[in-house]
Amino acid sequence: MKGEVVVIPFPFSDLSRSKFRPALILIDLPGADAVLAAITSTGSEPNAIALEQADFLAGSLSHSSYIHPAKLFTFQKSLIQKVVGTVSEAKRKEVVARIVSLLG
């Protein structure tokens, strides 16, 4: 699971409904949860990391995207809709290194 790009239901800020969005699994926790990083199509955040087709070992996203290491969350694995790909170990380590840097 670690390093997989998955599609999950992501709630709107007012919790009125949700939209399916990609996320990167960083930690497959024992039990029902995993720690994920948000993936979006915009990289306006200073810590966003570009995710290109070349970063995938398998699968892909439909267009260039950005992993947001400052947007981490715990998510119930049973709610994952599908796996769309797996990123390279180098890309996963880049994300983890950025998280460590952010933590200071």
Q: Model regions: which residues?
A:
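Conserved functional hotspots at enzyme active or ligand-binding sites that engage polyanionic ligands
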Residues: 1-104
